[in-house]
Amino acid sequence: KTALIEGALWWNQAIEAAGYINGFQVKVLPEDVDPMDVRYNVIQWVHRSTRGWSYGSSVRDPRTQEILKGHVTLGSLRVRQDYLIAEGLIAPYGEDDSIDEAKDKLSEFALARIRQLSAHEVGHTLGIAHNFAASADGRASVMDYPHPLVTLDDSGEIVLEGADDVGIGDWDKRAVIWGYQDFPDGTSAPEGREAIMRETLASGLRYVADEHARIGNRSSAGPVHPAGCLWDNGSDPVAELNRLMALRKVVLANFSERAIQPGRAMATLEDVLVPAYLMHRYQVEAAATVLGGQTFTYAMRGDGQTTMQRVSAKEQRAALSAMLATLEPEALALSDAVVSLIPPRPPQSGVSRELFPRHTGYVFDPMAAAGTAAKITLAQLLDHKRAARMNSQQLADPGLPSFADMLSIVINDRWPEARDARLVAIARMVPVVLVDELASLLAHKA
């Protein structure tokens, strides 16, 4: 409850930036008040057994769209999921006397995310949309979807502190100032807001909306703006993918039975392994936007913004190299030390969509895990929209790569060579996934 209230109160920073001191308050609702009462803005805490969304809704006057009541629904599932993510990152459960300390570290990681989530959903009730460019602008808004910014210290240890940002962002302040600012008598409100907009543009803050960050489903190559992606970090999506792959290598090397508490079924190690093994998946999507990518703005005539600029050939080649590195057998392989820790699920515990698919019945399947990760990368590289964009960009600038240029590199890089025997099976599996994705591309009707 405390974390939820603290996160919601971050909006007072934006309200005060608009000139209203202590103008945003969050208090516990009296027990005798109906949370559906339209006179009260409400945050409700709900429980859910599986993963799902939280919501920032509002009741509006249909005539004017004035917000009459904000109603936020936050799900407890987020605490459980972030706890699980942290367990996989640091495998914290060592000796019995260290378990309480580990739980404190995991709890703070999860609560930091709840603060951010609370602020995010309250932002929606204030009428503020997502801004998926914020993570590329130094985490400039709580209205992005933040990926935990986990780092390595100088000794190579995983650092969870600072994984989620604290406080309202500069973009959020600008949005509140534009939307809620009152103007002195004699000042034209349209002119005042136009001045606010000019100041915001001059600050360099960027904006990418929902419809240009997640077109279609998760496997489609919707986003084209390298800054406008979900669950990514950093101003350079390719550099961040390389950094995240190095971090992932350390996480998987350290993965052990210490990732679950004593007394839990060893088979549940797979639950913890899945988000750790696939921790790079969203950054792969972000790096893929560089291929055939364009930086663009929602420019208005006369406002001075650059409408569109294609990503350079050098940056596109770097993106392809980084994505192909995620397909290396060394990156896809799980050590036998990890695989041998995971037995079949206990009776009646069952399997779910939260686990890797498998071709081995009830036995853990490391090849299926590798295939899942390979498909994430190859589906992005071989999407029909990305293919069309790359061909289009070369028509405009012959120095930029076409889809055929990229495909030649992908195919020639993927056919297996002689390798360590432990990695041969994976080296052979990746071209199979490649051919499958090529078949899907060929089946697409233009």
Locations of the language-model features?
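Extended catalytic-interface subdomain
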Residues: R60, E66-L74, D82, R115-L126, ...
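Sec-exported extracytoplasmic/periplasmic mature domains
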Residues: L9-Y20, G123-H124, I128, P148, ...
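The catalytic-center signature of Zn2+-dependent metalloproteases
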Residues: V28-H47, A112-G167
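Conserved catalytic/binding loops enriched for acidic/polar residues
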Residues: D137-A446
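Extracytoplasmic/secreted envelope proteins and their assembly/folding machinery
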Residues: I5-A8, L111, R115, A119, ...
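Short pre-active-site segment immediately N-terminal to the catalytic Zn-binding motif
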Residues: T2, S98-S118
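Active-site-adjacent "gating/activation" loops or surface patches in catalytic cores
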Residues: R48-W53, S57-D104
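Fold-level signature of zinc-dependent metallopeptidase catalytic domains
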Residues: K1-D34
